[in-house]
Amino acid sequence: MTVHPTAIVSPDARLAQGVEIGAYSVIGPGVTVGRNTFLGSHVVIERDTDIGEGCRISSFCSLGGDPQDLKYEGEKTRVIIGNYNVLREYVTVNRATSADIGVTIIGDHNLIMAYCHVAHNCKLGNHIVISNGSHLAGHIHVDDYAIISGMVGIHQFTRIGAHSIIGGASAVTQDVPPYVTAAGNHAKLYGLNLIGLERRGFSKETISALKEAYRIIFRSSSLRREDALEKVRQTVADTPEVRHFIDFIQTSERGVCH
């Protein structure tokens, strides 16, 4: 463990073997940092934050600050960040409010680029990329392998589906289904994320089934949404991916981009 002499570490913080803390960083009470995690200079982890092993937290990140929510009245809440994440310069991650389970969660193997914001009560999965200057409002869920391009703003309580991609400078106000491409202000759908699906090793048969499901649900103007979902169940190959696609759309509370 290496702590720069100018860093300030609370006696209530716990640092594992191999942790490195750069100059002028501040580690507050209730913070745990896992093995071999690197914190650059001027990093602030305010309080009540768990960071896993093998993470790289770049200069001027601010983690574990109070939620930016007028309903927050000082309740004890947390941030949990998993293993092998990279947070670049000036990323901010806020603690949760007491709503839900009272935790802001970031999973494993994620890349969050410079100047991004992850607000209170967000839940991010694994292998996600969030590009420079994108901002997630409160209570957003982002599923595995999603890609959020630069300068994207996402409305609170929105869900971003697995293996989807959102184009740069988009404004997302409704749920983005899994496996799709979305872009624009306000964001609209532009078909499947074919390049991403191919790179992740989805079979031709699975991609073909998803294409047909997408066509029926989003390009059949004569069908109501519920009728389109039922038609997919009856006519499209019953794969786990198609079932997930249908379930995501059917359980949307904000409505989905289309």
Curated annotation (Swiss-Prot):
GO molecular function: acyl-[acyl-carrier-protein]-UDP-N-acetylglucosamine O-acyltransferase activity
Catalysis performed (reactions): a (3R)-hydroxyacyl-[ACP] + UDP-N-acetyl-alpha-D-glucosamine = a UDP-3-O-[(3R)-3-hydroxyacyl]-N-acetyl-alpha-D-glucosamine + holo-[ACP]
GO cellular component: cytoplasm; membrane
Keyword annotations from UniProtKB, A to Z: Acyltransferase, Cytoplasm, Lipid A biosynthesis, Lipid biosynthesis, Lipid metabolism, Repeat, Transferase
Enzyme Commission code: 2.3.1.129
Keyword presence, Protease: no
Gene Ontology annotations of biological process type: lipid A biosynthetic process
Xref: InterPro entries: Acetyltransf_C (IPR029098), Acetyltransf_C_sf (IPR037157), Hexapep (IPR001451), Lipid_A_LpxA (IPR010137), Trimer_LpxA-like_sf (IPR011004)
First-tier enzyme category under EC: transferase
Main location: cytoplasm
Assembly mode: Homotrimer.
UniProt record similarity statement: Belongs to the transferase hexapeptide repeat family. LpxA subfamily.
Job description of the protein: Involved in the biosynthesis of lipid A, a phosphorylated glycolipid that anchors the lipopolysaccharide to the outer membrane of the cell.
This protein's name: Acyl-[acyl-carrier-protein]--UDP-N-acetylglucosamine O-acyltransferase
The encoding gene: lpxA
